[in-house]
């Protein structure tokens, strides 16, 4: 249950019932930790993105941005789901339930562990760089002759050598000390991206895709939502709703030998009686 401030006493009435029925598992989802100084504050996804510093490392150098999907809501839901499953397993062993609490802030703070550790132990906050990696180069986006955008990722010197010789076809570039190591390439990122960008503008996306794939260079297209909808790797499944069938992305996991079919979306009140009967026992 995602509770607005002051909607229930602390601890919640649901959690208190654990002490009456020891096998009961409850989960309270809130914006901030129930025992923290911000526990009474309202918390919506974008606000938590801002509070946790996520927005400070997202977007272009000119301005911060929100992540395009509600990651704080999703993260809290995933953590709650994992905690409930863990509690179910524990109950099979001990026979006892658990009162679980989970907050959006704590969930996103955990996801921010890497930039947080960079600051706590390195004294530096990561900068916003758009579609660039802060510590690897080249790892950024380039426009092609036919106005497509391709993102490439060169992870080590071996890949860099192959990229220069087989894709850019300018082996003399390997002699340039400005690009002789990843540290040097990051330091001279602007000059590096100018050279690569010039070459990419001379080739179509199809030509570049073929070259990159043939030489096992990591790359991807910068798609929009339409591109995702038409993507050859997108798996879909159909679920029934009150308004009719809807095709949605398939669950990301697959179980060998199972078709992974989803049940229809419950209509309002569909399980009311079942739940009442279960809790009246």
Predicted features along the sequence, with ranges:
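Glycine-centered tight beta-turn/hairpin loop motif at sheet-sheet or coil-to-beta transitions
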Residues: 6, 145-147, 243
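Active-site-adjacent "lid/gating" segments in soluble enzymes
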Residues: 17-154
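Aromatic-enriched alpha-helical interface/lid elements that frame and gate functional surfaces
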Residues: 138-215, 219
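Conserved PLP cofactor-binding pocket of PLP-dependent enzymes
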Residues: 213-237
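Single conserved hydrophobic/aromatic residue that forms the stacking wall/gate
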Residues: 1-15, 19
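Flexible, small-/acidic-enriched active-site or ligand-binding loops
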Residues: 239-281
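Short, surface-exposed loop/helix-turn segments at secondary-structure junctions
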Residues: 119-127, 231-241
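Short Gly/Pro-enriched turn/cap motifs at secondary-structure boundaries
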Residues: 129-134, 140-141, 187, 243-246, ...
């Amino acid at each position: 249950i995602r509770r607005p401030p002051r909607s229930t006493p602390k601890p919640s009435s649901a959690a208190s019932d654990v002490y009456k029925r020891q096998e009961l598992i409850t989960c309270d989802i809130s914006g901030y930790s129930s025992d923290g100084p911000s526990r009474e504050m309202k918390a919506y996804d974008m606000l938590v993105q801002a509070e946790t510093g996520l927005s400070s490392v997202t977007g272009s150098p000119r301005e911060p941005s929100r992540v395009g999907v509600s990651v704080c809501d999703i993260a809290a839901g995933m953590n709650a789901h994992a905690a409930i499953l863990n509690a179910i397993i524990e109950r099979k062993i001990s026979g006892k339930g658990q009162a679980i609490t989970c907050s959006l802030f704590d969930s996103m703070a955990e996801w921010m562990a890497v930039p947080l550790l960079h600051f706590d132990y390195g004294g530096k906050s990561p900068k916003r760089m758009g579609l660039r990696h802060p510590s690897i180069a080249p790892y950024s986006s380039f426009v092609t002759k036919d106005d497509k955008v391709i993102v490439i990722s060169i992870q080590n010197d071996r890949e860099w050598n192959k990229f220069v010789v087989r894709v850019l076809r300018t082996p003399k570039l390997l002699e340039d000390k400005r690009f002789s190591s990843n540290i040097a390439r990051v330091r001279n990122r602007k000059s590096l991206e100018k050279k690569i960008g010039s070459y990419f503008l001379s080739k179509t996306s199809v030509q570049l895709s073929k070259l990159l794939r043939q030489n096992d260079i990591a790359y991807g297209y910068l798609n929009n939502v339409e591109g995702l909808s038409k993507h050859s790797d997108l798996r879909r499944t159909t679920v029934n709703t009150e308004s009719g069938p809807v095709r949605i992305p398939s669950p990301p996991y697959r179980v060998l030998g199972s078709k992974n079919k989803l049940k229809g979306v419950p209509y309002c009140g569909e399980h009311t009686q079942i739940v009442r009967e279960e809790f009246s026992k």
